[in-house]
From Swiss-Prot:
Origin species: Amycolatopsis lactamdurans
Keyword Isomerase tagged: yes
Region: Disordered, residue numbers: 243-264
Record-level GO BP terms: antibiotic biosynthetic process
Catalysed transformations (reactions): isopenicillin N = penicillin N
Entry-linked InterPro entries: Aminotrans_V_dom (IPR000192), Aminotrans_V_PyrdxlP_BS (IPR020578), PyrdxlP-dep_Trfase (IPR015424), PyrdxlP-dep_Trfase_major (IPR015421), PyrdxlP-dep_Trfase_small (IPR015422)
Modified residues (N6-(pyridoxal phosphate)lysine): 219
Keyword Protein transport included in the entry's annotation: no
Enzyme Commission code(s) on record: 5.1.1.17
The family this protein is said to belong to: Belongs to the class-V pyridoxal-phosphate-dependent aminotransferase family.
Basic and acidic residues bias (residue ranges): 251-264
Cofactor: pyridoxal 5'-phosphate
PANTHER family: HERCYNYLCYSTEINE SULFOXIDE LYASE, L-CYSTEINE DESULFHYDRASE
Protein name: Isopenicillin N epimerase
Top-level taxonomy: Bacteria, Bacillati, Actinomycetota, Actinomycetes, Pseudonocardiales
């Protein structure tokens, strides 16, 4: 697509013209067709019981089928969730009783902090040990190095492997299929944090040999906040036990059905999703989010994102000590580019300066191995916005 076409596509996204938004990795803005779909809430407000009982079920099943098709999954194995945090906590509380004391939970050393805490809590309750494997750092030549680091850390006591498909702080893309294959060969349960993956990379969950995969829609897919999902392997559905007891619960203990029911789900999925009366309208907007990017071409969108990421790397690398930590290898990177900031950087001052003086929304992260600047480039971003960031960094360094 030519620049004019991308500019026209940008016009369809709800962006504040006063803000430079380089932060889809935290939360993406809504395309107007997606926002318009969320206004289905008006129908719920006008007739709540008619909407929830009669109108919602077919809409919910359609949304599930569309998301499943987009992810390469089967709809009966795909539970909606509010976000990845909730989905992973559901998995953790469900598998906890099945993890024998004395075993180990293996994580990468770059996991999102609340997810690490989640597994540390499981370990405390079950008498397990949490171990980490160190992800290789720049220069990182190939995905083989990641696989070697993970497999070297797996041992006879490893019971569960948890890792991010795309590392949230650096944008490093892990070879998820190969990691899950290695774990499966060793009888290790796999749970993948896919918060950054939908819309960021091409997904085929049916071909990914993991036991549980949790993802978000509010980042790169540009779906509303409140859209998450949990995909589970066929032999893992019976393990899942939601913390809440609501409609869908089977007091008789019988295995719930995986056939579509009249509620827009299956008996098993209803048990996982139902929390009493709640607003499911964000889930119903998923088809609109998929359609919007399909209209632009999913492949072309990802190509544009990578093009902007490459421009960002070239424009900012080496300037005043900025060092890219995201690999350049196409199999290990995508649309997020992280830069190591010079030692001693006042991260709070830089963060506030970028926003207060220049209205640039971009994360400045504090990490044990040094501060980072993380730049997310979606199709609606422009080279001019990256230049604006470069000029702001120059001004703030004076």
């Amino acid at each position: 697509m030519v620049a004019t076409a991308w500019a026209n596509a940008r016009e369809q996204v709800s962006l504040d013209p006063a803000v430079t938004n380089l932060n889809a990795g935290s939360c993406g803005p809504l395309p107007r067709p997606v926002f318009d779909r969320v206004t289905v809430r008006a129908r719920m407000a006008a007739g709540p019981m008619d909407f929830l009982s009669r109108q919602l079920p077919p809409l919910l099943w359609t949304a599930r089928e569309r998301l499943a098709g987009y992810l390469g999954a089967r709809p009966e194995r795909l539970a909606f969730a509010t976000n990845v945090t909730g989905a992973v906590n559901l998995v953790a509380s469900s598998v906890q009783p099945h993890l024998a004391a004395g075993g180990e939970i293996l994580l990468s050393d770059q996991e999102y902090a609340p997810m690490r805490w989640c597994w540390e809590r499981v370990a405390r309750h079950q008498g397990l040990v949490v171990r980490t494997f160190r992800l290789p750092v720049q220069p990182l030549g190939s995905p083989d190095e990641v696989v070697e680091a993970a497999t070297a850390a797996m041992g006879p006591r490893t019971r569960l492997l948890f890792f991010s498909h795309v590392v949230s702080s650096t944008g490093l893309v892990l070879p998820a299929t190969r990691l899950c294959e290695e774990a499966r060969r060793r009888g290790v349960l796999t749970v993948v944090d896919g918060a950054q993956a939908p819309g960021f990379t091409d997904l085929d969950l049916a071909a990914l040999p993991c036991d549980y995969y949790a993802g978000s829609g509010h980042k790169w897919l540009l779906a509303p906040t409140g859209v998450g999902f949990l995909h589970f392997a066929e032999d893992q559905g019976g393990v899942l036990r939601p913390p809440q007891v609501s409609w869908g619960y089977r007091p008789d203990g019988e295995n719930p059905s995986d056939e579509r029911n009249r509620f827009g789900s299956t008996d098993r999925l209803r048990n996982l999703e139902c929390e009493g009366t709640r607003d499911l309208c964000p889930w119903l907007a998923v088809p609109s989010a998929i359609d919007f990017q399909a209209g632009l071409g999913h492949g072309r969108v990802r190509e544009r994102m990578r093009e902007l990421a490459a421009f960002t790397r070239e424009r900012l690398s080496g300037w005043r000590g900025l060092e890219p930590v995201t690999p350049a290898h196409p199999g290990l990177s995508g649309a997020m580019t992280a830069f190591r900031l010079p030692p001693g950087t006042d991260t709070a001052g830089l963060r506030h300066g970028l926003w207060d003086r220049f209205r640039i929304d971009v994360p400045v992260l504090d990490r044990p191995d040094g501060p980072l600047l993380r730049v997310s480039t979606h199709f609606y971003n422009t080279e001019t916005e990256v230049e604006r960031l470069a000029e702001a960094l120059k001004e703030l360094s004076k």
